[in-house]
Every structure is written in structure tokens, then in C-alpha cells.
Amino acid sequence: MEKRTILAVVLSIGVFYLFSFFYGPEKKPAPAAVSVPVKTENVGAAPAVSVQAAAIAPVVVPKIVSAADVTVETERYTAVFSGVGASLKSLTLKGFRETNKPGAAQVKLLANADPALPSFSTRGVGFALSAQAAYSPNVSSLKLLSGEKKQLVFTYVDAQGFVVRKTYTFDGTGYGIALETQLVNNSAAPIAGAFQYLFTSPFDPPQKDGRYETYGSSLYADGSLHTDAPKNVASATKKYDKGITWAAINDKYFLSALLSVNNSIASVELKKSAAGYLESDISTPAFSVAPGQAVTVAHKLFIGPKEIDILKAQGSSLEQSLDLGWFSAIAKPMLYSLKFFYRYVGNYGIAIIIITVILKIFFFPLTHKSYKSMKEMGKLQPKMAALKEKYKNDKDAMNRAVMELYRDHKVNPLGGCLPMIVQIPVFFALYKALMYSIELRHAPFMFWITDLSDKDPFYVTPVIMGVTMFIQQKMTPSNMDEMQQKIMLGLPVIFTFMFLSFPSGLVLYWLINNILTIGQQAYINKLVKD
């Protein structure tokens, strides 16, 4: 093995460490404001204080205490809405638990918002609608069976002569929730402004664990994913106002998003609130409502898992929230392959092993070429050493002589490295797919590995992986000097410590890959044997 091979391996380790912190370049938001028409309805020639026209149903304030909580239950979740701001206080996912221990609590999203500004609270921009306005719901609770659709309508009647209705439409089967916000102008003067929906969440991650390593705000704007950790807005507000498709608060596995419907998001402003929360203010396009008219703005909510098929079904490019990095074009097929094999074997660990075997077979020609090149280079070592001794005082002459030696023996000096480099994007893509796949969350493999998204609790697989790396090195023919040998002997130790805290699913991939490589190397050594 040559010095350049050692350098390639060492650089790969460095890139591997840094890669998990890279999420692709972020576009700078354009400063231009967005002006998009919204749906305006003519109430008719009724008196300014009335909403009796046929196009708008009469305002009937339900006989329920204002600001009361309303519970909505479907087969997927239990949501608690508040009359304060007609907001969503929390949503508990029935199919997901905080840990994989028996009796663990179900995952509850949005519950850590600022109590004064629950998620999806709505305020007026340009007119006096408070985010703490007390709305009256049309029902005290809702329960939906699979396939059913039902509505929750919150109504707020303002003393200044306008009415705001927020209508949530639920699907008993999915995670998506339709939202329509309507302003009815019963006053004698036009009302100009916009609606603004508020997301608030703790500025610091609720917990210091792997789930929150990508915690923060994200949005899809102008065809690009933009992610902002809380620290990005700790000292200054950040605003996006061009081509926004959706805006969200997310962590590694779950997403709470507001989706645009017919360009209904004009801008998103991120900041640290006065109360110390991460705040996302999502504004609609500006509107003007004449007396006797109404305006309705539509959005869609998604609060659920970052599972690629579920996200894709929502539309609006929501699947882009699953950020698989620079090599997502490779990582997404890897993820789909993982899901495909799982359907047949029922175990994600086995699915990882199958993918590893397929990749090893696919890259066999490149690996064969790499090892063959290294073997041929090894044969030239004595002649190269002689040339170095002969031209030790003339580096230019030595380099020319070495290149001539390569040409005479038809050896490519990069032949051992290039096949390795070609495989690096595939490894990083699979790394991303395994690291950020919710499918592996709490997925058992066998024996003591009960969660492929968590580290091996007894560190057995990382240690075995280190041993297989050592065996690999011993099987690789080399003409290294003493210093190079020490460097190479240190690599299994470095990798072992690196992988102690890595998800066991990723360690499993690397371990199986090493075992297959040992067998492959033994076979190739036999093929290229003198």
C-alpha cells in the first residue's frame, strides 16, 4: 500500500467526521416582497353590521365557554386545540413512543411551545386581531374513524365589527389537516392587512439526545431547502419572502409544518422571542376587505413523522424536509431499497445486510481493479527504491524516472485510489439514509440490539468491526516503512472509538462490509497471485 493510499484513508476519516455537519449550501432570501391574491367573497348589500348574505353563513357564537380546549382523536393522533388564538396546544402520535422501553410515553409534539403563544395562534397584521383572542369552538370534542372527515370551527367576533373563523378539517386516516382562515368585514370601513400564524418552541433542544441533533426551523423556498438552528437567529431576525412552499419546526424524526395552498405564504420571519423561545412568524399575502365582504386564506398542516412516503403524499415538496445531504440523489434510492427489502424480510437489520451484499457485488469490479493495481505497484517497489537512491539529489529527475517506470510497466499510480474514491459518495449516501431514517428508530435487529437507531449498548459490534479492520490490513500486501505501518495499525482503533456512539444500524453495515471485504480480498489475492 502506498503513501497516497494512507493519505486517502486518513482524509476519508476527516471527511466522514465533518460530513454529518454539512447540510448543503443555503440560498440567501431575496428581498422582494410577495404579493399574491387571496380569495375574496362578496357578502352582498346587507347592512355593515350583518353577515346575513347567502355567500356567508350567519355568525352563530356557540354556547361553549370561550377559549375552551377541544380534543380531536383519529387513528393516528390525539390533538388538543385551544380557544386562545384558535391554536394547537399539542398533538400526540399514537404510533410512536419516546423510547423503546415498555410503557414509554407516546411522542407529543408542539407541547413545549410558549404558553402565551401556542402553535398556529393567529394574529392580524395591519388590523387589531390579537394572537390571544378568545375563539368559540363549534364542538367540545371530535372522534374520527378511518376514512372519516370532520371539521372543527373556531369563531371570534370582534367589537370593532369583524369576524374571524378558523376551520380545521381532519382526515381520520392521515396526518394532514386542512386549515381555512376567514375574515368577514361587518364594519363600515375597509380592513387591510394579513394573517400571521405563529410557531413557538424552546430555543434550546428539549433534550440532549440524537433526536434533537437537527432541531430547529426549516422551510422550502425558491426551490431550495433552508434550515436554521436556533443559534442562527439568536442575535438577529432572519426573514424569507420568496417562493415559500412550507415552513416548519422539526427535529431528526418529526415535523410540524404549515404548507402553502395557492401561494398562501408570503413570508417567514425567524427570531428569538422576548420570552426566550424560537419563534417563526408565517405571514399570508396582504389583502383588503371592503365592508360587506369576506376573505378566506387556505393552508395545510402536517404534524407527524418524517417518513419519506408520508411526506411525499402531502405534496408541496414536503419530502424535501428529510435532508439527506449532498448525495440525496443516491441516499433516497438507498432508503427506498431499505424499505423494499423490509417488506419481505420484516427486519431492518436483515435489510441492511442485503443492501451491503448487493453493494459489495456491484463494486466488485472496481475493488478488483484497485487491489490488482496495488499488487502491481508493490512489484515495482524495489525498482522505485533504486531510482530514489540514484536520483536522491535531483527530485525532478527522480520524478521523470518514476513516471517512465510506470509507463514501461503500464501501471496507473492512481489505480489503487480512484476506485476507492468512487465508492465514497455511495458510503456517505447510505450513511445519511441510515442516520436519518425514522424507519430504523426503535427497530430491533436481534439479540441485544433492540434499536438500530441507537448505539450498541454493549459495544460488541464496534469492537468486532475494529477486529475485522485489523484482519483486513494483515491480508493486504504492503511495502510500508515502519512509520506507515504504525499509522495503519492505528486506524482500526480510531474507527472503533468513532463507531462506539454511532447507530448500531450503521455499525452493522460497516461490520458486514468488512467481513465481505475480507472474503473478497482473499479471493482477489488468489486471482492476482504470481
UniProtKB/Swiss-Prot annotation:
InterPro entries: Membr_insert_YidC (IPR019998), Membr_insert_YidC_N (IPR028053), YidC/ALB3/OXA1/COX18 (IPR001708), YidC/Oxa/ALB_C (IPR028055), YidC_ALB_C (IPR047196), YidC_periplasmic_sf (IPR038221). Coiled coil: none annotated. One of its GO terms (molecular function) is membrane insertase activity. It is a multi-pass membrane protein. PANTHER family: CYTOCHROME C OXIDASE ASSEMBLY PROTEIN COX18, MITOCHONDRIAL, OXA1. Required for the insertion and/or proper folding and/or complex formation of integral membrane proteins into the membrane. Involved in integration of membrane proteins that insert both dependently and independently of the Sec translocase complex, as well as at least some lipoproteins. Aids folding of multispanning membrane proteins. Pfam families: 60KD_IMP, YidC_periplas. Keywords: Cell inner membrane, Cell membrane, Chaperone, Membrane, Protein transport, Transmembrane, Transmembrane helix, Transport. Gene3D superfamilies: 2.70.98.90. This is Membrane protein insertase YidC. GO terms for biological process: protein insertion into membrane; protein transport.
